[in-house]
Every structure is written in C-alpha cells, then in structure tokens.
C-alpha cells in the first residue's frame, strides 16, 4: 500500500487564499509538528524521514510558501519525540530553544534564527524531562530533570551563565505548572511515603500556600500498615548493566519461608515504572495477601541517557 503524501498549507482568513508551503520534493516523510514563531509571518515546520532519524525544522514564509532550513539533526538511532514538543521560540523574536541528545543525554540548547547554536544551556550526565519555558524579565530557563537520581524528578531554573537553582526542596517526584509570566508555579510532589502535596510557589521558590496536603489520605492509609516498595538494583543479562527495580514484601514476612513472586513491568521504550512517587494499587493488596511483588525497568527505559534508552533500537524483544 502506498504511503499517504503529506503537505502543509496556510490559509489567509482575510483574503481567503490558501498557500502551500515548500517542504521539498521527498514525499516519504512525516510532518510531526508545525508551530508559529513569534513573527506571525513565519511558520516552523518539522520534517522527519520515515526512519525518524533525520529531523529538519523548516522556517516558512507564510505569505508566499518559501522555506529555509532552520535546524537539522541526525541520530544513529532515532530522534526522540519529546524533542519536538520542547521547541520554544523566545519572545525576543531572534532565538529558540530545543532539546537534543547529541551529547548522549537530553539537554537544552539555545539557537538563533539563523540556525547557529549559541550555547548549551544545561550540561551533565543526566536527562532533561520537561522544558517549561523562558522568563525574559528574570532571564531564566525553567526545566525538570533527573540530575539527582533516575528515580526522582525535580524542577530547576538556570540562567544563560549556567547559574542553577533547585525550586522543589521535597524529595520525590515533582510536577510543575507555571503561570504565563513565571511569577508563580504550582508544584505537585509525592514519594513512596507521602501522597501528592499540591502547593503554590512564587518565582523565588518560596512556598506561598499549600493547596492540598492529603494528610487525611496519609493517616487513613497508615491504619492498614501496607507494604512499601524498597528500591534495589539487579544485574541485566549482560552481567554489567545494573537495572533499577523495586520490591514489595509482605509486612510480616517470615525468615526462611517461601513466598510466591509476581513481577510486573511495562518496559516500553522511554517508559518508567520504577520511581520514587506515591502509588497505591492492587499490588499493595497482593503484598498483604502473602505475595512478594517486584517491578523492573530494563534496558530501553527512561532516565539513564541515550545509550541505555535506545539500545533496544532494532533489538526490541532481544535485550
């Protein structure tokens, strides 16, 4: 069956004219995202080959349809989809931010609209997870990452000189939502001991107020004396790679007694099941009923760099 041919068109609401954008002669492609720049006459068109290992971002003149290549990246495995969502054009109209794994880890990079890389905003042996945006007043980039542990997610701000500040002091898994002007953000944090706590913070990282602490949930669960996951590492089949895992044992486990073991896992590319967050499910019930429950994040899962994440490329089901 012949693949569909994709094209991009801009419709002028006032003049009622449709203009096709020039995306090149190659037809066996994807257009996974399109995005307006800060200039209403310029459109960014993302173009991927079928193997998804060659990305081009075209800068299109929305009035006449002409395009130039703004950004190009090739990867020996594939371009991770999260890079596409992390493209952000800055309000100054001359720069954009995108994530890339070209260093072996997912990091933020600043480019100008001539396609020149200005700097790596973040560096190190850890992956960026989310890019929340740029505050032009405070000149700060906001992001989340695994830089303290593959099991935990924290929120940070960083300036163009690399000065970084951690905005989430509570240990565990953090999710943030920023106000439009970055004056405030709502953070939701949990860990294996604490159900989600939702709080409002100001731009300096100071807590304004707790919106929901879930203390009632925490106290109610305490009465059941539920088993908690214990984080461990186990060797992979290659004998060298250590895999993150958790194990949950019956609270009243007796030494020397054998227990049935249930292993649960998802293992999809770039997925993650082993993390320090609140989770309450039938797995806790099984542990209460005399089962040992374990979960493993094997090779190909998230939080440990490109080589670990993409080693299953063309090898899915073998590693």
Identify the role of each PLM range:
Residues 1-184, 190-196, 200-201:
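Beta-propeller folds
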Residues 40, 175-319:
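Serine-hydrolase catalytic core recognition
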């Amino acid at each position: 069956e012949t693949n569909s041919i994709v094209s991009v068109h801009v419709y002028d609401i006032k003049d009622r004219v449709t203009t096709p954008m020039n995306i090149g002669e190659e037809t066996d492609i994807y257009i996974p995202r399109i995005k307006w720049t800060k200039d209403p006459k310029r459109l960014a068109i993302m173009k991927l080959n079928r193997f998804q290992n060659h990305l081009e971002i075209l800068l299109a003149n929305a009035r006449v349809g002409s395009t130039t290549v703004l950004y190009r990246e090739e990867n020996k495995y594939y371009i991770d989809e999260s890079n596409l969502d992390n493209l952000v054009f800055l309000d100054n109209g001359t720069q954009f931010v995108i994530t890339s794994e070209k260093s072996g880890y997912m990091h933020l990079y600043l480019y100008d609209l001539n396609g020149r890389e200005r700097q790596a905003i973040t560096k190190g042996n850890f992956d960026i997870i989310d890019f929340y945006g740029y505050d032009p007043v405070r000149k700060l980039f906001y992001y989340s990452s695994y830089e303290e542990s593959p099991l935990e997610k924290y929120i940070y701000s960083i300036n163009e000189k690399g000065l970084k500040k951690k905005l989430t002091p509570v240990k565990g898994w953090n999710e943030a939502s920023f106000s439009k002007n970055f004056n405030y953000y709502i953070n939701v944090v949990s860990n294996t001991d604490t159900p989600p706590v939702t709080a409002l913070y100001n731009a300096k990282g100071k807590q304004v107020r707790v919106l929901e602490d879930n203390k009632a949930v925490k106290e109610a669960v305490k009465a059941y004396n539920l088993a908690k996951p214990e984080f461990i590492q186990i060797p992979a089949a290659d004998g060298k790679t250590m895999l993150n895992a958790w194990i949950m044992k019956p609270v009243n486990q007796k030494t020397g007694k054998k227990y049935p073991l249930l292993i649960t896992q998802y293992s999809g590319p770039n997925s993650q099941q082993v993390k320090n967050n609140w989770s309450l499910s039938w797995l806790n019930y099984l542990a209460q009923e005399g089962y040992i429950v374990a979960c493993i994040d094997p090779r190909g899962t998230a939080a440990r760099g490109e080589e670990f994440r993409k080693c299953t490329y063309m090898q899915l089901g073998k590693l």
